[in-house]
Amino acid sequence: MQDRNLIDVNLTSEMKTSFIDYAMSVIVARALPDVRDGLKPVHRRILYGMNELGVTPDKPHKKSARITGDVMGKYHPHGDSSIYEAMVRMAQWWSYRHMLVDGHGNFGSMDGDGAAAQRYTEARMSKIALELLRDINKNTVNFQDNYDGSEREPVVLPARFPNLLVNGATGIAVGMATNIPPHNLAESIDAVKMVMEHPDCTTRELMEVIPGPDFPTGALVMGRSGIHRAYDTGKGSIVLRSRTEIETTQTGRERIVVTEFPYGVNKTKVHEHIVRLAQEKRLEGITAVRDESSREGVRFVIEIRREASATVILNNLFKLTSLQTNFSFNMLAIENGVPKILSLRQIIDNYISHQKEVIIRRTRFDKDKAEARAHILEGLLIALDHLDEVIAIIRNSETDVIAQTELMSRFDLSERQSQAILDMRLRRLTGLERDKIQSEYDDLLALIADLSDILAKPERIITIIKEEMDEIKRKYANPRRTELMVGEVLSLEDEDLIEEEDVLITLSNKGYIKRLAQDEFRAQKRGGRGVQGTGVNNDDFVRELVSTSTHDTLLFFTNFGRVYRLKAYEIPEYGRTAKGLPIVNLLKLEDGETIQTIINARKEETAGKSFFFTTKQGIVKRTEVSEFNNIRQNGLRALKLKEGDQLINVLLTSGQDDIIIGTHSGYSVRFNEASIRNMGRSATGVRGVKLREDDRVVGASRIQDNQEVLVITENGFGKRTSATDYPTKGRGGKGIKTANITPKNGQLAGLVTVDGTEDIMVITNKGVIIRTNVANISQTGRATLGVKIMKLDADAKIVTFTLVQPEDSSIAEINTDRENSISKNKDN
């Protein structure tokens, strides 16, 4: 026999239907707040239950278990733990901007400590919570049956202040979640008033009175663009940063003191995280972490090692720990029974509509009550005006029903009026009592007229809402706790996490680069160039040495006419004897592309200056440094090269420097760079020297009359000549002889200007490296053969040379003044 209680259903359709029902139940009845009062059902039921229980601010606290049990039994049959946890949260100053529950006992801490069991704690409503329920007994909101029909509960509270904005909301439903930040009470009320006064106001205008969230734990909001986006769309993200200060102890050491944490951050977990970072050596320089918080406020201390930078450590803490967090807006709330993501303006509009309805319903309630009372008083006045006749009717009636009927018939009274006359005490028959009744009746008529006027004039309703909110603002508002920082500081750059210190950057002839701590040497002039025993292999040497800061930007110019950029801290640090890292691991160089020049692009040293480019085919170009402010990761074209041409070097010039260019066939030309106008990056340039057939440029330098011109030929001959022997002429000429080229000495391998104290590193086509001091090379005239400076094998030729600091000179002798950071040798 088939059981009639069993119903066959399709599992798929039943799952869909049941899950949708479950999801909507969670969304509407549990997890999301109502846009009108900003409360989820559990919070609304707790507050209403406490109000019905009489646990108001003027009454003693009651056991939390009593409140929880009452709410669970009457309104919220979902377990006592969820009710108690919701009530506890409403009593925590770090959770609610304005607490709705006044807790007595252990209600937890911002360190993550849980509240004591509900049998130990007590609670009552806070004063401001009464404003959410004010006038609830005046038919201001709709009521509905509770879960079993035994009680009635409000669908929404009157909410005389915009609680959804003031205290925010968080909740996870099925397939959706809400995250609305708390705001300042005064600012929220002002925003509501602005919309009522100026219905066309924009989000930007609203932000003039409600500039952003105001979290109970304070802290800093970095930037305002995220706030505007969230207010405009209901979604967005902001950066919250702890309020910190750096103190200096009596012993001169620094410490970081945190006085405010971002909203929702667990102080104990931050403490544990910092200790773990220090132990794992991911964050160095921290010696101790202490929580010195007390009743006076939060004080979280991070002790710093003496030689460490507190600023750098703090920036690392912001990046690695919850001292800086993101708050993601998702302003989802129930609007007309439907979950919806709302903008700030929509939240305010919904609140205003709710308040209008509350005021209208309250006014109607008061008007109906006043009219009912006036109706009674009107009957009493009629009776007093005909007192003798009324008394006679009553005395002559056998029953009160007959008396009531006679009164209604004789004086055209209603049933309620006639009953009030019968219930009237004899003492009210005095003349004095009549005057009181008349006075009350007149007052009621005036009140009824006023209430009718309110209902007839929407502008009066708006005025009442504003006046009552102003009173709440006066009583409960307090200063903003969260500071809104101007500007966008939404992320920390790597530079913020690196301590600024002086370093040396070296590049070897074979393309190995490394960073060395400045204390590897005693001193080094910024922008200087040279070498000092850096331990590279015998077949390699340091060709470029730049003294700089870890925060400085270095520009790398290549033979292909491209320029790349690196921050000094991006170059790996090695010991003095280490080989370093191939430059191709840091820069995306093409096959055959090599670094010709490294220049420190520190702004104060390059401001107003130009880069002077010289190519193998004698083309020169001058371009302002500012043209190279934005260089992509894969480099940028510094100048346009003709086919077969290559960039020889780049000089940093003032715009008025003399330049000398030397050619392979032994000629040179000297001219002032002012004869060349500044050109853009994409320009090719102009002729700097007119080359003879099969000739090419082998060197270019800035030149001053107190310097010397050093030339070295392929067969190992060299000479120094005074710069005064090279007259300044126009650019583009064939030049004058700088060396007498013969088969004996060979063609020119290179030309530089020197001061006479430098060393040179000479490289042959066999890979042999020879080092000598410039002072060992004879000083002769311009058009001379030169002298033999080194012996070469029969088939060996010198292919290039470079200047370096002399081995027997101390780098400590080099001036470290930042203002003179570009050494003369840097541009040679």
From Swiss-Prot:
Question: Can you state which reaction this protein catalyses?
Answer: ATP-dependent breakage, passage and rejoining of double-stranded DNA
Q: Does the keyword ATP-binding apply?
A: yes
Active site (record annotation): 120 (o-(5'-phospho-dna)-tyrosine intermediate)
Signal sequence bounds:
none
One GO molecular-function annotation for this sequence?
A: ATP binding
Main location per the UniProt record:
cytoplasm
- Which InterPro entries does the UniProt entry name for this protein? GyrA (IPR005743), GyrA/parC_rep (IPR006691), Gyrase/topoIV_suA_C (IPR035516), Topo_IIA-like_dom_sf (IPR013760), Topo_IIA_A/C_ab (IPR013758), Topo_IIA_A_a_sf (IPR013757), Topo_IIA_dom_A (IPR002205), Type_II_DNA_Topoisomerases (IPR050220)
Question: What does the entry give for GO biological process?
Answer: DNA topological change; DNA-templated DNA replication
Domain Topo IIA-type catalytic: residue ranges: 32-497
Motif GyrA-box: where in chain: 524-530
Q: Quote the EC number.
A: 5.6.2.2
Q: Does the keyword Metal-binding apply?
A: no
Q: Which Gene3D superfamilies match?
A: 3.30.1360.40, DNA gyrase/topoisomerase IV, subunit A, C-terminal, Topoisomerase II, domain 5, Topoisomerase, domain 3
Keywords from UniProt, A to Z, are:
ATP-binding, Cytoplasm, DNA-binding, Isomerase, Nucleotide-binding, Topoisomerase
| CC annotations in GO | chromosome; cytoplasm; DNA topoisomerase type II (double strand cut, ATP-hydrolyzing) complex
What EC class is this? isomerase
Localization: Cytoplasm
CDD domains from the entry? TOP4c
- Superkingdom of the organism of origin: Bacteria
**HAMAP family in UniProt:** GyrA
Subunit organization: Heterotetramer, composed of two GyrA and two GyrB chains. In the heterotetramer, GyrA contains the active site tyrosine that forms a transient covalent intermediate with DNA, while GyrB binds cofactors and catalyzes ATP hydrolysis.
**According to its UniProt entry, what is the function of this protein?**
A type II topoisomerase that negatively supercoils closed circular double-stranded (ds) DNA in an ATP-dependent manner to modulate DNA topology and maintain chromosomes in an underwound state. Negative supercoiling favors strand separation, and DNA replication, transcription, recombination and repair, all of which involve strand separation. Also able to catalyze the interconversion of other topological isomers of dsDNA rings, including catenanes and knotted rings. Type II topoisomerases break and join 2 DNA strands simultaneously in an ATP-dependent manner.
Similarity annotation? Belongs to the type II topoisomerase GyrA/ParC subunit family.
Question: What does the further note read?
Answer: Few gyrases are as efficient as E.coli at forming negative supercoils. Not all organisms have 2 type II topoisomerases; in organisms with a single type II topoisomerase this enzyme also has to decatenate newly replicated chromosomes.
Record's protein name: DNA gyrase subunit A
Q: Its encoding gene is what?
A: gyrA
